[in-house]
């Protein structure tokens, strides 16, 4: 059964113990079972003989390691003699010397060093033996290694040297510091050495990145540079890597991120940095651990947990929006409750040991009946906090007075000083300045001058005194705070005075002000300081006759401030010389420590019973000073203070159980004092008299009773392997009893101080902060009693030392420096006799304390030896300050006889001390027996207290390294690599070159090791430590005066106060500050402190020497009274304030100048950015304008090229049509009749192929809802099938210059449609591909790229021809009228020569050829209706264009279905019609997908029949033959409608798609649409809305039935050419339709165009009263109503201006290309066409020259003409012509003619007359831009001129010559021009060729005049 230890630790105590017991039982059971199984397997065959022992052989390496650990020195020597290798390595990679350093085995360490073991060997963590010795604080090993030549500067894996692991104050630390100082290594040099490694990596990384290296490059293990820097704590390297894009979440091969490594190795600053840069805290490594799971400290773990929560919230809110993260976000984590277990020991006890201790603790409480009901262990005790009375509602401060500064008094003497102080004391003005020294008189009452409001009033930006505020402690603290950052050195506030003068309270107020004004979290630090002071007051203060709360120790507070942010980052308290003798014996009238009084009055009866303190006053330690007349108010106050103490202990980390344990230890201390000894034998051997009490004490201490009794009464020593036992006498046993109590209390007090320090230490990364300290020293005051003993001597000598330091700093140093610098000093001060007194006691080796330590080293010295030695010292001393009481101060003998007393002349007076018992009180070290017993205590706290070591000053050494607690030394030494790397990188050499090689004798002499642990030695080292700290900073003195000895408020004792003023030297201080020079900075310090002031005042004289620069600054500041020394400036104290004021004024002026300049620069920068932006906008506009110009030029060239190509093509095709017509008319009719019901084929290929639509003759023969179109009307013959009697073409009309040229015959045929029912047919709707339709559209159709298979057709009705190779479908042979039957079959099952319907089917995506051309087919609206009258619907006269879907057959052989979906429900039919796809003869193969047919051209009237567009046959004589011949024409006289067709830009090399199924509009997963035939494609995502119907024209009159087809088609021949060149890109959005929601206007890519002239035409159509109108649909919206679809699109101003220039250059152009509606008369297109046909002349004529040009290129064309003869009759109405020679009348005809022009054998049923010559090429919308429809180019005007020429042959010749020059690259075209052929006669007017090709041998002399018809 295995359970994780973390789980056990998280369980409650009782549950964990039960679980542990169960686990133990199961383990034992499993062990027995395993043994039984093992015995059964062995079979018990081999029994061990009795008496024969089994031996296990271990290796020598294992044995020697075990012997070193257990200090078996003889065994180690024996193993080395047997051959054990002294160089054996342990498992961690270290040597045996590492083990010796770990377990403090000095003897074996010396042996190993003698045998050559490397003292600098490093283990796998780069720890040398010196590192381990310092970490374990083994000074003997440290000294041995140093003497052996160990390198004290070796760095481990974390970059730490051994000194970093030596706890401050330990002997190991002292040895290392002394050695480094002896060899010339200071602390700054150590810091530079530690920075070598990170600076080296920083340099390498910079070089690597500058050379183009990858910041995220990984090594073989996947580790990046960021991983390495985060693990090592190199903050600067991490910042550099992050700036260059380092991957925060990069993982190595073990899935460890940089955040994992920073958390694991305790890099708190880097953890903050990574989290601030959005590192993911949720990533896990290969072990499934997040960074918070492996955090090295609780602060890092809490930080990471907080980051995880923030990350989750950020992901929930907005995953894409990163939140701002700063390092300050993680600085608010409070650590008010640190774990106590982390402070107990460096080596944490295992959980089994902790459980064992807890079990025994429970047993202990059970046996002693335990404690009564207590508060919950988890919650803090309920306390009633003491409300502070120092926060009044209103604050009234006394106004400033002239006597605020005593240094300004006119009369200086003792009486005047005393008078001013008394007067101020009477006015409650207890604060007074003496220059920079502060004088405080204790009022013995609370004054409302220490509130938070007052503290805020004294906040100053410069630290100078405010003239409007009286003197105050806060002002002194404010000055120290500002001096801290001005001088950038520590500041020390020293409080001195007698006991009860108010030093402790003054220090509290100073700390309160500093923490509140400079704390990042004021409430947190105020609370911590309050609780820390409460604990310190309880355990370190006592009630005396001079003070109710008298300090019994020296306190030195250190407040750490961040140098950059200027707020408190932590604090630490150092305590010295605790009055431990006060615990066991109090002077008369004084009490013990306050904690015992609080326990007596604050504990309840039950609690006292549990602690065995029912009779509290009966204990000896408290009975001496306990008063019986304690008032009830005082008892109540003590109870409240105890409650405050419990709360304070909870705050700093003690749980309720631990507080209970703490009180139990205090109770044990009191019970120890009650143990008495008695002598049962004559040898006076001591025995414990009360064994029950001893057992009770042992239970409370949780030690063995026998061991405790033996340790108290005997002394066991080991000498050369022998054990020596000595019995103590009762006196010695009592001495060790009291020493045990004092030691336990002292160590407990040290433990509490360390815990407080841990609580006050900020959790910020101390190593990364540059900190400065403000120290506050509070020493116990001078005291004198009737009987002064050794304790009073130590207290008064401490005050003597501090007074001497003040005199030395204030007087002696100034006097010495004045002499050295040659400055005259106005006043002189006598040094006094303090130096002689201090030398008498502290001088070595002849001082009194040295003699006392010698006597204390004896096991038990004889008392009379010390008086004798003291007498000899007094006689030999040269000072009169210390003398024997037998003599008076003048040396006269007072009395005879030797006595153990002497008199000392202190600075405060004469005091006589008795030395009786001084030796015993000086001893402060327990016997080894007592130490061993206390170390083995089952109480965790007691065991820890005695396992910890003591510092030389007697303080308990903390378990934490020294660098955990700032301080000046730690800020220099222990700023880790993660700190800011500032400073010069000094390349230090090896240790041998760095350290000065000196003899070890001097070093050993300076070590002064071996000092005994005595009170005198602790006092000496404490004073030395305090003095060293004070000398590092600038002092600020506060003199505290006690007004009376009775502690009464308002009482001023003149004599008592005058005595204090005299020995404090207040008068001397006043004179010093008035006449002396208290401020004496060096020249460099002066210039550095006032650098802004000096840099401005010096001007050009900055290069002068420092002395001259200081002189100039002082002169220009107009200061007087200063003096210049040789190296220093001597200033008066008020001159510092004046310089500070000038510096502040100058700083304000500088800030103002910088503000103005920065604002100016910012504005300039903004203007520059705006200018750059404007330039960019201008450049973009210029680029777009130039691009538009180039596009227009290209358009002009393409129009000319395209028109010429089409003209030649029409000429060639015209000849073929007429030749095939006369030759194959009869054959076509016969074949058409035979193949009416034949199987139709549909095929698909990657390259578009010609398509054919089955004839709808059967549907037209019967009753149909669809009227024949105008195409059919004008192509119908009579029943005999003879051609139309009109043989001559209509007369040539006059041309309008605005009419766009086009050679397309479809533009003409689009206007020649008529219906059967002339009464209900609107004749004015343009065809979708006509020029009018394109002109109407804002986005013209794009010109598709020409394909060799492109064919032209102007009708939907029939496409005849043989099945080409690769066809994949057949058309069903039998189908119902009105339906379209399609049968799918494999290509090999198709018949060869059958009429077919080749449909270009969609293939899967990827099967299409990018060069494929689109084939457009328009589906008939009502053709699928089998029957019905023409009056079934109001839409009977209109053709409804609907979407068609092909529904797959279920089983693969069933009929498919093409479903028509209405495109415009609001305007047209709502019914859905389907075309059944019937199965044919071949095998049926189902389609994969259902194909939708979007309505490409919706809402067309029946006279606008659907259009089938096939790729045209290109002409190679044009270099731009890839351009579409479907040039849009601008027919001004046709009423036009609007559609929502969108024409996307075609990419180069791809097939143009249909407008609704372009590549730009298709989805990512949509199937590719058919390049040419949208019928079988999927549904469009954009379905264009319906177009409102235009105003109808006059209805045509039907005449004649349809004719039968005639003429067989010839076989195809000739290879097609390859197209080239991309089509122009379309531009401009289509307008929204009326009656529907307007479509969003897509902005053009680059160009915008003016409004279409179609608006003019439409408006004209509505206002023309000459035309007959048909009634519009009721649901139709007005054409030009509010929702009119003719929306004005955005246009380009530049393009409009350019059009005006071009219009001016054209002789035929009107003033504006966009004429208003009334600019031209409106006429019917039928009237225009009738005038043309009635003219009798050929509009377009053939050109033999053009034919030769094409024939020279080897073209072979095949033209099959098949038509059907239908009876027809026509009526011609002639009206006046417009200026374009267009007739306004309408030519009506009811004869239906079927003229089929077939290409490649595909019969095409055409609804136009063969002779009209108005064949029109279908306009493709893919390649045309909007400006192609709206603008007239210059080249177009050229073609207009050629068309209007009277001599057409001459015009044609001019056109061909011009075209050849531009387009032809062949060399044979010149010869073709020399042999023109005669012009062929025009075809009959009743026949219209739709697809024209050049016939073999045809003449190309002239193009057909019909192709030049400009009426369309």
UniProtKB/Swiss-Prot annotation:
This is Unconventional myosin-XVI. The keyword S-adenosyl-L-methionine does not apply. GO terms for molecular function: actin binding; actin filament binding; ATP binding; cytoskeletal motor activity; protein phosphatase binding; protein-containing complex binding. The lineage of its organism: Eukaryota, Metazoa, Chordata, Craniata, Vertebrata. One of its GO terms (biological process) is negative regulation of G1/S transition of mitotic cell cycle. One of its GO terms (cellular component) is cytoplasm. Myosins are actin-based motor molecules with ATPase activity. Unconventional myosins serve in intracellular movements. Their highly divergent tails are presumed to bind to membranous compartments, which would be moved relative to actin filaments. May be involved in targeting of the catalytic subunit of protein phosphatase 1 during brain development. Activates PI3K and concomitantly recruits the WAVE1 complex to the close vicinity of PI3K and regulates neuronal morphogenesis. ATP binds at residues 497-504. Highest level of isoform 1 found in brain. Also found in bladder, kidney and lung. Very low or undetectable levels of isoform 2 in all tissues tested. Phosphorylated on tyrosine residues by FYN upon stimulation with CNTN5. It is found in: Cytoplasm. It comes from Rattus norvegicus. Residues 371-404, 1220-1246, 1259-1300, 1317-1373, 1543-1650, 1664-1726, 1756-1794, 1869-1912 are annotated as: Disordered. Binds PPP1CA and/or PPP1CC. Binds F-actin in an ATP-sensitive manner. Interacts with ACOT9, ARHGAP26 and PIK3R2. Interacts with components of the WAVE1 complex, CYFIP1 and NCKAP1; this interaction mediates PI3K-WAVE1 association and actin cytoskeleton remodeling. Interacts with KIRREL3. Residues 1339-1349 have a biased composition (Basic residues). SUPFAM superfamilies: Ankyrin repeat, P-loop containing nucleoside triphosphate hydrolases. In the N-terminal section; belongs to the TRAFAC class myosin-kinesin ATPase superfamily. Myosin family. In the C-terminal section; belongs to the NYAP family. Pfam families: Ank_2, Myosin_head, NYAP_N. Residues 1110-1365 are annotated as: Involved in CYFIP1- and NCKAP1-binding. Residues 401-1144 form the Myosin motor domain. Residues 1220-1238, 1869-1878 have a biased composition (Basic and acidic residues). ANK repeats lie at residues 59-88, 92-121, 125-154, 158-189, 191-217, 221-250, 253-283, 287-316. Residues 1585-1633, 1710-1719 have a biased composition (Pro residues). The gene is Myo16. Residues 1146-1175 form the IQ domain. Keywords: Actin-binding, ANK repeat, ATP-binding, Cytoplasm, Motor protein, Myosin, Nucleotide-binding, Phosphoprotein, Repeat. Residues 384-397, 1264-1282, 1547-1559, 1664-1674, 1769-1787, 1901-1912 have a biased composition (Polar residues). Coiled coil: none annotated.
